């Protein structure tokens, strides 16, 4: 006999509970990845990666917690401890690895318990649980727009604390309502374990690509506001398609085509740009939502599945999620034998094969309770998503109008800076505000920032280029490296009259690097050209050859023009540093000059880590290079360049 649905109030509370649990889980996940990045650098990428992947098996704790505290108390206890852990994440600096792991693991178990509660309530619970998770991903998108994609868990401003407290208070309130309502905390839930497993590959696609504003704006080459609007569109479409396919089902041929579409889109999407990236993201969202909807609908009315099987299935999917995220990014550090794009493609294929194997329902599914629910959820997602996008558009910095004030002799002082921020992660802490303050301390007119992430998982899937541009009120020129989501940005408080990107290609390294060329208007009627970027690191002969080839390409782009500055993390050491760095002669022989020691790592870059350089054309006098702030890895360098009177 089908289970009767709970009251509307309890249903709304349960959906809100799972949605808010999803938001908190995603925040804890991103925090863990940033902290784990630092730990991986210390204990080894393979070891650190295995530790993080193992943690994602935490959903198996759901049945353990039920056994320890009882079915009725398990979810409230998990939520209470999670609230404390989430507040501790934001209050503790630096965030210790154990705390990040504990909060993330508990959040995964709590999500599993919340989904099990929804699935235990009535026959349509499996579909409703997927709608609730989808709503949570969309709500997470909106929450992150308040910090231009920088997570509130890392922020210390009053608005971030108020938002965190509000979200957690809502989570507690929803838990109380569900606990008092007519959703019985059964030890079994309706449907098989398949959807609990498939949820995680589906989440991978949403969180990393189709509903990631940073991924979408970087790939499409549009502002963050537009990327947020695109993510909101994908969220609404995904919810509608999921519920529609849960009602009407998909024949095996349709599932096969959908699976092929998901896998193909997932393989191509990481390198897609422009309008093609937008179309592929929407296609991947539609195909994946159709497959998950068909699987959820097929589970309606199935025999009950114990919480143990649900926990194990969820743990298996979560481990695949973690493996996919880490293997994809770590390919740039320790290359795989094949392209890392096979990772999302394999996850998409796994999603497809699992659904194709399901029996086709004998009749159309009547999902009476879920249909009005998803209408309200989709409408809410659309409204808050587009309002958030409009708010981002309204607060975007305008075109810079600053000029350099001439001295008595007509010359102008141009302050330049190079800063490798290592994805914004300093000793495990994603503190973008600290980086912005360090840039402000140097007071540059133009700064080249290397190792900038725009949607990469290890930096919390933040759009760091957009965030820095907004925070500092500077214009940006983006140049990709590993993909459209990782590279370098030129920030300028002066007007940029022209900008282009020079492709450096890919040879011995894992990244297809590029160099930005920005033409600045300094106010004297004559342009100043800035070339900035990041070259491949390493001292193998093949890497030396690659850097030399990159220098030649950059120098060709320069073409000997006057009033030119070349700077960045060039990963080139002084010539006498073993094993010898002859490629440094290329810019020097071409006529560029520097005040840095070209033979040894001497002051100011004297910590035996001096790969960062500032060169100028012969007509631009430059003051000695300075270290702006002492950091554990790359120390930002700055110098004042004198622009002689024009004419």
Role assignments for model-derived ranges:
Residues 2-442, 470, 475-477, 483-647:
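Active-site regions of metal-assisted phosphoester/phosphodiester hydrolases
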Residues 439-452:
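Proline-aspartate-enriched helix->loop->beta-strand connector
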Residues 454-475:
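Cys-nucleophile CN-hydrolase/nitrilase-fold catalytic domain and related Cys-dependent amidase chemistry
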